[in-house]
UniProtKB/Swiss-Prot annotation:
Family membership: Belongs to the complex I 30 kDa subunit family.
EC number(s) on file: 7.1.1.2
Keywords in alphabetical order: Electron transport, Membrane, Mitochondrion, Mitochondrion inner membrane, NAD, Oxidoreductase, Respiratory chain, Translocase, Transport, Ubiquinone
Quaternary structure, from the entry: Complex I is composed of about 30 different subunits.
Organism field: Paramecium primaurelia
Function: Core subunit of the mitochondrial membrane respiratory chain NADH dehydrogenase (Complex I) that is believed to belong to the minimal assembly required for catalysis. Complex I functions in the transfer of electrons from NADH to the respiratory chain. The immediate electron acceptor for the enzyme is believed to be ubiquinone.
Cellular compartment(s): Mitochondrion inner membrane
Predominant localisation class: mitochondrion
Single GO molecular function: NADH dehydrogenase (ubiquinone) activity
Protein name: NADH-ubiquinone oxidoreductase subunit 9
Enzymatic reactions: a ubiquinone + NADH + 5 H(+)(in) = a ubiquinol + NAD(+) + 4 H(+)(out)
Top enzyme category: translocase
A single cellular component GO annotation: mitochondrial inner membrane
Superkingdom of the source species: Eukaryota
Length: 209
């Protein structure tokens, strides 16, 4: 009687389906990593709160390069601008080891949050160290309104931007309400001039709280 040939053990039965490997298995996009490697570049991610969300810190001088890479790179072209805002970190005190230590005493810090459909990642870019940045309006149409709000509220000047008019404030106003140096007490009174059919700012006495 000939010995029987041993059968191989299969861990997957015929009815069980094998898990397909994701098509795009990237962490932080390598195109951005190599592009900004020589700059003051840092990034963080969270594996507990949102594992597919990265936070990247760049100098403001790299804003034009960032816009060109996001618009021309193959895996980064299919993206959406989720939100854009700014922060005034003048005199900000942060704990050592926190990623905000890179933004300390940099004045205005811009924040752009993008979602990349092919990578299935969300990356928030913090641009620090300058009040003149390149606009991303040419690649993301919704950046027009977002950057106009940032410009009038924080006094940020955008380069290569077609429309920089104020949205909420009067045209030609020189103050920025969201800056820390903006006075918290009233120093002017806004009245409507019925003869000129426009608003006017009248100086009044300072009020101490």
């Amino acid at each position: 009687m000939s010995p029987q040939r041993p059968q191989r053990a299969f861990f997957c039965s015929e009815g069980a389906k094998k898990k397909k490997k994701p098509k795009y298995r990237f962490g932080f996009p390598m195109a951005l990593y190599f592009f900004f490697e020589k700059l003051n570049f840092s990034y963080w991610t969270s594996t507990t709160v949102s594992p597919n969300h990265y936070v990247c810190v760049l100098p403001a001088a790299a804003s034009q390069a960032l816009a060109s890479v996001l618009g021309g790179e193959l895996f980064l072209g299919k993206s959406q601008l989720v939100e854009a805002t700014a922060f005034d970190l003048t005199g900000q005190e942060v704990a050592a080891g926190d990623f905000l230590v890179f933004l300390k005493n940099n004045g205005i810090v811009l924040s752009y949050s993008f979602y990349f459909f092919l990578l299935k990642k969300r990356i928030t870019f913090f641009l620090h160290g300058g009040e003149k940045v390149c606009s991303v309006e040419a690649f993301y149409s919704n950046a027009n309104w977002l950057e106009r709000e940032i410009s009038e509220m924080f006094g940020v000047s955008y380069l290569l931007k077609k429309d920089s008019r104020n949205l909420l404030l009067d045209y030609g106003s020189s103050f920025n309400p969201f800056l820390k140096k903006f006075p918290s007490t009233g120093h002017t009174e806004v009245v409507f001039n019925s003869f000129l059919k426009t608003t006017a700012y009248v100086q009044n006495a300072s009020v101490e709280l």
